[in-house]
Regions:
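Periplasmic N-terminal accessory/gating domains of Gram-negative outer-membrane beta-barrel systems
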Residues: 1-84, 109-110, 119, 123-125, ...
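Transmembrane beta-barrel strands of outer-membrane/channel proteins
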Residues: 93-99, 139-143, 218-222, 269-275, ...
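Residue-level signature of outer-membrane beta-barrel architecture
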Residues: 63, 82, 128-130, 208-210, ...
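Flexible glycine-rich, low-complexity coil/linker segments exposed to the extracellular/periplasmic environment
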Residues: 160-189, 294-316, 372-392, 503-528
Length: 528
């Protein structure tokens, strides 16, 4: 979408060669970045909406602007501004339906399709005056229902056997063992399955012209994404029960007051609360607390006279017990002072992020088997688990980001503008609990304090050649600082030796797996 832009996994944009987490996202000038691990608010789920596109007035990717208002962005900023109502009532309705019967009866492999393949998108916008020239509103809603097959080792032809490195006979034998000795459901575990995803984006904005000098804006942006069977694990073939569900709810509410103090001074105050919630859970065939997974390696099949192998997994998804809740409070105030020759900007930006994070990767545990025979004999060669040491291993982090800045802009020659600015950003991160045992054994402190204070001078020359508004030359230099990826903070708080302990044992010390018990009693899962 823009030069020097790279689309990385999870739809996180990398700008100008910087880390994807260095890209800032703003909506109406306020934070719209995912507080857990960067990207847009919905980047972790890959949801289709961060905001209804019908609510966006304009957006831009900023990589060559030295304005001090752009903070916490080492690579650049993706910025969007929302629509508002006018004195005229306007609205729209839209619908798009890619019906199942319009889709090919065959999948990409040429096999006849058995599952629904359709997308329905619809919504509306409506805006206008509540009181003309005084009070206006604008609302928008987008909905998407996406249905597409979930393909799990769907072997229907000789070409599929080569593609998946497994035959149906091998799969049937594997599933029979999994059902008889590991309690796997009698429902199909491989093939194609219906997968439906529901997503919504709702937007509302009110603008109140209190008087000739004061404009109050209140807007709310809400997104919802329910991605059933959306979590796929990292084994080559994951049977149906290993797929997890992902639910994401995000909401931001903003209040902005723009005040014209006098002919030369304008003040703009913005206050926002951003809420993000991600809830990952096992699929419907597993208990809500999740169970270990069993990874069987070297599952062999004879295909075209040659032995081919693959890895197959049953049990729970490795992080289908994670939950991330974030509340971000932000206040920004900008003062604009304009004289006949110079435009001044002064402001501050305070942001407090309060997070509760239940990190869950490998908390359910995993068994490794090096053959189907050992899988059948209940003899794994390895067991690994991050065992919780406390009843609730949720970690709480409170992060403060504060910025103060000022700049001037003036015309120094025909078509030549000079911008000089200075920004100072301070960040304070939470400190993990001190672990005496780690210090005694390894000499490492787990309670190291982390904070940053970065001064960022910036200068830019912008030349509109001959002021013909056709040719522009820009030259700028400055320092840009991005905030730390909060996921690193979560890891630091969680892996301090007080919340979990790692179990990693090899044969002959591996406990005998009893998945039937695990499915009925969380306490039966092997711990320390």
């Amino acid at each position: 979408i823009y030069p020097w832009t790279v689309n990385e996994p999870a739809d996180i944009e990398n700008l100008q060669g910087q880390l994807a987490s260095s890209t800032n996202y703003t909506l109406d000038g306020m934070n719209a970045k995912n507080p857990t691990s960067a990207g847009s608010t919905t980047s972790r789920s890959g949801a289709p909406y961060s905001i209804s596109i019908e609510a966006v007035r304009e957006f831009k990717v900023v990589t060559n602007q030295y304005d001090v208002g752009y903070g916490r962005s080492g690579g650049g900023t993706v910025s969007a501004v929302t629509k508002s109502g006018t004195n005229d009532f306007t609205g729209s309705m839209f619908a798009y339906n890619r019906a199942d019967w319009l889709s090919s009866s065959y999948d990409i492999r040429g096999n006849r399709r058995q599952n629904d393949f359709s997308t329905s998108q619809y919504g509306f916008t409506f805006g206008g005056p509540i009181i003309k020239d005084k009070l206006h509103f604008f609302v928008a809603w987008d909905h998407q229902q996406d249905s597409r097959p979930l393909i799990i080792a769907d072997v229907q032809s000789a070409e599929d056997e080569l593609r998946f490195n497994v035959t149906r006979a091998t799969l049937d034998n594997f599933v029979t063992i999994a059902r008889n000795k590991y309690g796997v459901s009698n429902s199909p575990q491989y093939g194609t399955f219906d997968k439906k995803r529901n997503s919504d984006a709702a937007f509302a904005r009110i603008d109140w012209q209190i008087n000739s000098n004061n404009l109050l804006t209140v807007r709310n942006n809400f997104t919802y994404d329910n991605n059933k069977l959306g979590l796929q694990d990292n084994t080559t073939i994951n049977l149906y029960e290993s797929f997890g569900d992902d639910l994401n709810i995000d909401n931001s509410i903003l209040a902005s007051l723009r005040t014209k103090v006098n002919a030369k001074v304008t003040n703009e105050l913005k206050v926002q609360h951003l809420y993000t919630f991600q809830d990952s859970n096992p699929g419907d065939q597993l208990p809500s607390y999740n169970i270990p997974r069993a990874i069987v390696e070297n599952v062999a099949s004879t295909i075209n006279g040659a032995v081919r192998t693959t890895n197959i997994q049953i049990g729970g998804h490795r992080f289908a017990q994670e939950k991330f809740t974030n509340n971000v409070f932000q206040i920004v105030d900008n003062i604009y002072y304009n004289t006949d020759k110079v435009k001044y900007t002064f402001g501050f930006d305070l942001m407090q992020t309060n997070s509760e994070s239940l990190y869950g990767s490998e908390v359910n545990g995993r068994f490794h088997f090096n053959s189907v025979a050992n899988f059948n004999n209940l003899t794994p060669y390895r067991y690994y688990r991050e065992v919780p040491l406390v009843a609730d291993p949720t970690v709480t982090s409170n992060i403060l980001n504060a910025g103060i800045y000022g700049q001037l802009q003036t015309k120094i020659a025909l078509g030549l503008d000079l911008t000089l600015g200075l920004r100072f950003d301070y960040a304070k991160y939470p400190t993990a609990t001190f672990n005496q045992l780690v210090f005694d054994e390894l000499g490492i402190r787990t309670d190291n304090k982390l904070q940053s204070a970065i001064l960022q001078p910036r200068v830019q020359l912008s030349w509109d050649v001959n002021e013909n508004h056709k040719d522009y030359i820009r030259l700028g230099a400055g320092i840009f600082a991005s905030d730390l990826n909060n996921y690193a903070v979560i890891n630091n708080l969680y892996f301090d030796g007080n919340h979990t302990a790692t179990v990693d044992v090899r044969s002959p010390n591996v406990p005998m797996p009893n998945f039937i018990d695990y499915r009925n009693n969380y306490a039966s899962i092997p711990t320390l």
